[in-house]
Amino acid sequence: MAGVGIPSGHVVDGQDITGLLDGGPEPADHRDEFLMHFPHEHRGSYFTVWRHGDWKLIYYYNPTHPENPQRVLYNLKKDPFENNDLSSKKPGMARKMIREMISKLEETGAQYPVDFNGKPIPPKVF
């Protein structure tokens, strides 16, 4: 769209949706996955969001206490406003989503938040 090339060695995790901007149909290869990773402080939150199909996981890193991350899990089809955290009712699904999230973070070479000693805090399955 802007006519700018992608720098060598730069990972692009996305797909061309130019057609949608022009009023066209959704791409045939549309993915039902979405990763948003923010390993920096923003109002106290360091987080990764992983959506796969109807499920959405939000993983909160805790640089002050890295051994104590938090997670929330939603079924967006049944709960589009994210009112009901299912992470304790569906721990198997929460762990599955965390494993998928870790795989995608590793695949894209994502940076992890660091603790106050500068040590990376990778997500853990719990």
Indicate where each model-derived feature is located.
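C-terminal cap/loop subdomain of S1 sulfatases and analogous C-terminal strand-loop tails that border
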Residues: A2-L76, F126
